[in-house]
UniProtKB/Swiss-Prot annotation:
This is Uracil phosphoribosyltransferase. GO terms for molecular function: GTP binding; magnesium ion binding; uracil phosphoribosyltransferase activity. It catalyses: UMP + diphosphate = 5-phospho-alpha-D-ribose 1-diphosphate + uracil. Uracil binds at residues 200, 205-207. Catalyzes the conversion of uracil and 5-phospho-alpha-D-ribose 1-diphosphate (PRPP) to UMP and diphosphate. Its EC number is 2.4.2.9. It comes from Paraburkholderia xenovorans (strain LB400). Belongs to the UPRTase family. The gene is upp. It holds the Pfam family UPRTase. Binds 1 Mg(2+) ion per subunit. The magnesium is bound as Mg-PRPP.
Length: 216
C-alpha cells in the first residue's frame, strides 16, 4: 500500500495480484464475463487490504482439545454500500470476504454537467457500523462526494466510512479530499487525468457498460 504526497487521505493498493487483474480489466478486448469475474476477484483482494486494521478482541472458546482466548473482530459491524450501477459489481467480492455484512444501495447518475443526480437511497440501520462505499471509478469525484454526503447527513462519522474504487483521476481525488478529508479513499490506481469528456485516462472505459454489456 502506497500514498501520494498530494493526497493524504488516498491509499493506493499496489499488491501484484491487484495490479495484474486491473491490467486485464483495462484491456478493451476483455469480455463482459471476464470483466465481471475480474471485478469480483479484485474487489475481494482490495477488501482484504482495507480491512486489515479492523479492531480485534478475544473470545473464550473451546477447541476439540482445550479452551483458548481466540482473536475475533471487535466492535463495529460492517455495511457494504455500492454506488449504482457499477458499484453492484464490487459487492459480491466484499460479501465473499465478509458474508455477514449488511448491504445498502445509493443510486446516482451523472448529469450532462457531470454533477450527480440521486435517485435511490436504501441503507441498513446506521448505528455502530463501518460503511464501505464502493464504485469502480472516481472521475470528477462528484458522485463519490455525494455518496459520502448521504451517509454524513444521517450522522455517520467520516472515520466510519471507507471508499473503495478501482481507478481514480487526480482531479476527482482532489474534489473528494476537499469535501471529505476525514474519509479514507482506497484505489488500485491513480491514473493520469480526465479527458474533455470527463473520462479517466488511461482508465478502463465505462465500468457499468463493461460490467453489464450495455452501450452508453
Amino acid at each position: 500500500m502506497t500514498q501520494d504526497s498530494r493526497f493524504p487521505n488516498l491509499f493506493i493498493l499496489d499488491h501484484p495480484l491487484i495490479q495484474h487483474k486491473l491490467s486485464h480489466m483495462r484491456d478493451r478486448d476483455t469480455s463482459t464475463r471476464t470483466f465481471r469475474e475480474l471485478l469480483r476477484e479484485i474487489t475481494l483482494l482490495m477488501g482484504y487490504e482495507i480491512t486489515r486494521n479492523l479492531p480485534m478482541t478475544t473470545r473464550r472458546l473451546t477447541t476439540p482439545l482445550v479452551e483458548i482466548d481466540a482473536p475475533v473482530i471487535a466492535g463495529k459491524k460492517l455495511a457494504i454500500v455500492p454506488v449504482l450501477r457499477a458499484g453492484i459489481g464490487m459487492s459480491d467480492g466484499l460479501l465473499e470476504l465478509v458474508p455477514s455484512a449488511r448491504v445498502g444501495h445509493i443510486g446516482v447518475y451523472r448529469a450532462e454537467d457531470h454533477r450527480p443526480v440521486e435517485y435511490l437511497v436504501r441503507l441498513p440501520d446506521l448505528e455502530d457500523r463501518v460503511f464501505i462505499l464502493c464504485d469502480p471509478m472516481v472521475a470528477t469525484g462528484y458522485s463519490a462526494v455525494h455518496a459520502v454526503d448521504v451517509l454524513k447527513r444521517r450522522n455517520v462519522a467520516g472515520e466510519n466510512i471507507l471508499f473503495l474504487a478501482l481507478v481514480a483521476a487526480p482531479e476527482g481525488v482532489q474534489v473528494f479530499q476537499d469535501a471529505h478529508p476525514d474519509v479514507k479513499l482506497y484505489v488500485a490506481s491513480l491514473d493520469s487525468h480526465l479527458n474533455e469528456h470527463a473520462y479517466i485516462v488511461p482508465g478502463l472505459g465505462d465500468a457499468g457498460d463493461r460490467l453489464f454489456g450495455t452501450k452508453n
